[in-house]
Amino acid sequence: MAYIAVPAVVDSRSSEAIGLLESFGVDAGADANDVSYQDHDYVLDQLQYMLDGYEAGDVIDALVHKNWLHHSVYCLLPPKSQLLEYWKSNPSVIPDNVDRRLRKRLMLKKDLRKDDEYNQLARAFKISDVYAPLISSTTSPMTMIQNLNQGEIVYTTTDRVIGARILLYAPRKYYASTLSFTMTKCIIPFGKEVGRVPHSRFNVGTFPSIATPKCFVMSGVDIESIPNEFIKLFYQRVKSVHANILNDISPQIVSDMINRKRLRVHTPSDRRAAQLMHLPYHVKRGASHVDVYKVDVVDVLLEVVDVADGLRNVSRKLTMHTVPVCILEMLGIEIADYCIRQEDGMFTDWFLLLTMLSDGLTDRRTHCQYLINPSSVPPDVILNISITGFINRHTIDVMPDIYDFVKPIGAVLPKGSFKSTIMRVLDSISILGVQIMPRAHVVDSDEVGEQMEPTFEHAVMEIYKGIAGVDSLDDLIKWVLNSDLIPHDDRLGQLFQAFLPLAKDLLAPMARKFYDNSMSEGRLLTFAHADSELLNANYFGHLLRLKIPYITEVNLMIRKNREGGELFQLVLSYLYKMYATSAQPKWFGSLLRLLICPWLHMEKLIGEADPASTSAEIGWHIPREQLMQDGWCGCEDGFIPYVSIRAPRLVMEELMEKNWGQYHAQVIVTDQLVVGEPRRVSAKAVIKGNHLPVKLVSRFACFTLTAKYEMRLSCGHSTGRGAAYNARLAFRSDLA
């Protein structure tokens, strides 16, 4: 049984209902006996009457929650004195839960006006003790509707109600001489049987509902042309506030349903209607429906080449695993010889990116894992390579189940993992007009310690000197490390025992405040040295413990100008590894492939398409009326981007139909202008309720994994005051 809302009122005759549907383009057929009509004319009178004492928005928001397929009615009780009089005249109708003494007095066949005991009992009697739920003049419209949805009879002491007809509990003489309104289409006389909701395949009514199962709103209706002002007011409110929740349906689909034909589905809203009705349909997917998170990868065969005195020598044969094909194409990598070092001895950006995107390297002779030595000083260094082939091409899913919600990402990498270098490379990559990973979207856990006075690493250094009984940093290093730079186990254990309370008492409290603030500023990528850092700071984002195919300790030794020098950083690296949990690390490439590869795939699909039809943003929407209350100009609604999306046009049309408004947050808009263009102010957001599920975005669309919360300003007017707002997600696209 489905309910179809049409913004018009007709008589309850079936022929009139069919005529109403046909006026909207529905081919209902002459003998459509399974279509019935719910006459909501009485609701218009109730709506008009309710607007005298309640806010229009509150009444409409309540009425939109009415389940029109559930039979319910208000039962209007007489005033207390008249109710007792009615019971005295009709003892058989006295409810069982009435006070026994009062019942006994009412059943006496005498005048009770001078009966002191009766008068005392009557004064103590409360109607609400007998009838529940009970509607009164102070009851909110939403409570009225909730009670109607939960039961068939809702008792009331007032006729100022909404959503159902009013049945008189007693004969008309027991009520006041005049009710507030006496239209027969709203009031059901005492003793008259109440008509129930007809059990037809299709019920046609005036008012849409988000509580009615299988409720649809006829699409293509011009709201401004609705002649009845109250119906127009209702639809305007519903379309502006609840548009993402209601289901549109085309006249074509209604025609097919009524005439029991196979559904001809053309739009996303029609598809959803067919799914809600559990009816068979067929949609031919176009070439645009491509899972961009399925990525082709290969294993790259390479040789380490040494050239001495003009002679070429292959010192090692390696296999680089799970390298995305799209990255090889982007970098132009083919079978050839390559120099992978710059003049200063550092790796080239392309080689660093290629290795970081892989799942490590294997020595083809020993079949053991091979870690690259970052040093440019022999022995066992790589200066030149020769790529000799590509094998084992297959497809992987770069969006694993761990990414269930759109949340911040915490990436745990050991010290010396080229974080600064790889972030510089990612910051330079822009695909389809979207920066893949802007540097402003990255937070480093080192920032927590650097905010302390003295810094966390300096405090650790001074305490460790006391433990070792030395005065200088050099003596501390000699005490901890042997000549091969391997730590003495017992001495490193002593330092670790001192490190734990420092991390708990100094680092963790500061980190909690830092991450609370940073995560309210955006969905940021957070780097840390140990997962325990984030766990102890109550970090709620995706937590990934990662590794890279490089010897990180060697990279630490070649980095200069760090707190305490290279050797002290090496000691800290050992301590952070001890501080980490026992969780098995994944390759850093598993995260980088998710960041880059779907976008390269999408670029092939929509590279030549109009950006206006393939771009969208999902963000927190603030009505301009609320902004104007805090001094903003109100030139447009406030919008704080949360997710940027690129997808083919057909996929965009499907995304546009989804219910984004069910996700909400408290948003704080500041008056602090952000440097740069376009003109914008910084903002903060705290998610309320559930986070946005990744699956809602669709596997046929690319979305940004990070975001910085900012509200764009389209005008040059002065900013308003900083304030907090309750905002919901909204879909914004040039298609809308």
Swiss-Prot record:
Name by which UniProt lists this protein: Microtubule-associated protein mu-2
Subunit architecture: Interacts with protein mu-NS; in viral inclusions. Interacts with polymerase lambda-3; this interaction stimulates the ATPase activity of mu-2.
Organism lineage: Viruses, Riboviria, Orthornavirae, Duplornaviricota, Resentoviricetes
Primary location: virion
InterPro entries, sorted: Reovirus_Mu2
Family membership noted in the UniProt record: Belongs to the orthoreovirus mu-2 protein family.
GO biological process: symbiont-mediated suppression of host JAK-STAT cascade via inhibition of host IRF9 activity; symbiont-mediated suppression of host type I interferon-mediated signaling pathway
Any Pfam family matching the protein: Reovirus_Mu2
Function: Minor inner capsid (core) component. Displays NTPase and RNA 5'-triphosphatase (RTPase) activities. ATP is the preferred substrate for hydrolysis. May function as a cofactor of polymerase lambda-3. Associates with microtubules and plays a role in the formation, structural organization and morphology of viral inclusions, where the assembly of cores and the replication of viral RNA occur. Together with mu-NS, recruits the other core proteins to these inclusions.
Cofactor: a divalent metal cation
